[in-house]
Amino acid sequence: MGGTASTRRVTFEADENENITVVKGIRLSENVIDRMKETSPSGPKSQRYSGTYGASVSDEELKRRVAEELALEQAKKESENQKRLKQSKELDAEKAFANEQLTRAILRERISNEEERAKAKHLAKQLEEKDRVIKKQDAFYKEQLARLEERSSEFYKVTTEQYQKAAEEVEAKFKRYEYHPVCADLQAQILQCYRQNTQQTLSCSALASQYMRCVNQAKQSTLEKGG
C-alpha cells in the first residue's frame, strides 16, 4: 500500500469571473486549464467547467503539472514585464532626447536674443557717441562764430574811433573850411546793419570793409591836400 501513489478525482470549478478555475484551493487561469487538458489522457477538450478532470490523477502528477503551468505563466509574465520595461526605457530615452533637443533649441534662442540685444546696445552706444561728437562740434563752431562777431565789433569800434579822431584832427586843422562827413552813406548803412543784426554782427563785415576803404581813401586824400 505504501508503494502505490494515491489517486483522487479532481474537480474544476468556475468562480464569479467565469475565467478562473479553482483546483484544490489553487486559482488557475483559463489558459493554464486548457493546456493541462490538452496534455491530459482523459476526456474531450471541450469539457471545461463543472466536470471531472481525467479518470484518476495522482497528487504528484497534479502538483507537477500545476507547477509547470505556473512556471510557464510566471515566465510569460516576466517576459511581458521585460517587454514593458524595455518599452518604458525606450520611451524614457525618447523623452530624454526630446527634452535635450528642446533644451538646446531654447539655449540657441536665448543666445540669439542675447546677440541681438548686444548688437542693439552697441548700435545705441555708437549713436550716443556720434551725437556727443556732433554736439561738441556745434559748440566749437558757435564759440568760433561768437569770437568772430566779437572781433568784428571791436574792429568796427576801433575804426570808428580812428575815424572820429582823424576827423577831429582835420577839423581842428582846417576850421575855416566847411566839411561834410566822409563816407556818410556807408556809415549810415553800417549803423543800420548793426542795429538790425545785433546778434550776427558778422553779416555786416562786407559793409565795414567798404567803409574802411572809403575812410582810408578820404584820409589819404585829405593828407595829400594838406601836405
From Swiss-Prot:
CHCH domain location: 180-222
UniProt short sequence motif Cx9C motif 2, positions renumbered to this chain: 204-214
Described function: Component of the MICOS complex, a large protein complex of the mitochondrial inner membrane that plays crucial roles in the maintenance of crista junctions, inner membrane architecture, and formation of contact sites to the outer membrane. Has also been shown to function as a transcription factor which binds to the BAG1 promoter and represses BAG1 transcription. Plays an important role in the maintenance of the MICOS complex stability and the mitochondrial cristae morphology.
Gene Ontology CC: one annotated term: MICOS complex
UniProt keyword Membrane present: yes
GO BP annotation list: inner mitochondrial membrane organization
Recorded GO MF terms: molecular adaptor activity; phosphatase binding
Modified residues (Phosphoserine): S29, S50, S56, S58
Biased composition (Polar residues): 39-55
Encoding gene (name): CHCHD3
Annotated membrane topology: Lipid-anchor
Lipidation (N-myristoyl glycine): G2
Modification sites for N6-acetyllysine: K142
Stretch list, region Disordered: 34-60
Motif, Cx9C motif 1: chain positions: 183-193
Places the protein is found: Mitochondrion inner membrane; Cytoplasm; Nucleus; Mitochondrion
Transmembrane segments: none
Alphabetized UniProt keyword annotations: Acetylation, Cytoplasm, Disulfide bond, Lipoprotein, Membrane, Mitochondrion, Mitochondrion inner membrane, Myristate, Nucleus, Phosphoprotein, Repressor, Transcription, Transcription regulation
Lipoprotein as UniProt keyword: yes
S-S bonds: C183-C214, C193-C204
Modified residues (Phosphotyrosine): Y49
Similarity section: Belongs to the MICOS complex subunit Mic19 family. Metazoan Mic19 subfamily.
Pfam family, one: MIC19_MIC25
Quaternary state and interactors: Component of the mitochondrial contact site and cristae organizing system (MICOS) complex, composed of at least MICOS10/MIC10, CHCHD3/MIC19, CHCHD6/MIC25, APOOL/MIC27, IMMT/MIC60, APOO/MIC23/MIC26 and MICOS13/MIC13. This complex was also known under the names MINOS or MitOS complex. The MICOS complex associates with mitochondrial outer membrane proteins SAMM50, MTX1 and MTX2 (together described as components of the mitochondrial outer membrane sorting assembly machinery (SAM) complex) and DNAJC11, mitochondrial inner membrane protein TMEM11 and with HSPA9.
Name of this protein: MICOS complex subunit MIC19
